[in-house]
Amino acid sequence: MKNERDPHYYSHTRVDLIQFIPSGTTKILEVGCGAGMTGKALRERGFEKIVGIEINEEMAQEGRAFYDQIVIGDVEKIRLPFEKEYFDCILYGDVLEHLVNPWQVLKDHQAVLKRGGTIICSIPNVRNYRILKNLIFRGRWEYTDDGILDRSHLRFFTLDSIQRMLKEAGYEIEGLAKRSSGAHWVKWIHRLLGSRLIEFLVRQYIIVARKR
């Protein structure tokens, strides 16, 4: 379903992920590279080897100029043509929630990630208060064209389920960033209600994890 999207869907530059790439990284795999805007930004930053995976062939052709190689296909079905422990870092920018079995993909990709290598994921938080409000008080679970209840999402995660998924796949979380709803009043709510309730304001988590 993702490959039927408006072309603009594939044209985001994921600076929110790029900022967490560890120093010393040379070889990067971007899963779901779209039209290559993130690849372009990576190229401008001088990384030695940039590889993408993209299911949408038309978008992949658009992005080829920014990558050393783009593997076209379904990430859950293709076998990656790379040596063991080839990459220093793998990016999953809003990808895992679109997969049937993201747990297995994360495990499989350990083979091409070097020991101690990094993965950086962005994943929507289904525990956001707007989703819960509509579900609990209105009985509504309404899919949308984008966002947390994007129609093409097959899996839904909370912080706890994200942590368990990564741990079971063999990764250790080293960093966590939160993108929140109502950002101007988040700090006030945090002080008033306590840190445990902040998860209800989070729209998306960005997780930095290391291969054990």
Task: Provide a role label for each language-model segment.
Residues 117-123:
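Conserved beta-strand signature within the Rossmann-like core of class I S-adenosyl-L-methionine
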Residues 145-161:
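Acceptor-substrate binding/catalytic loop of class I
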Residues 160-177:
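A SAM-dependent methyltransferase catalytic signature shared across enzymes that methylate proteins
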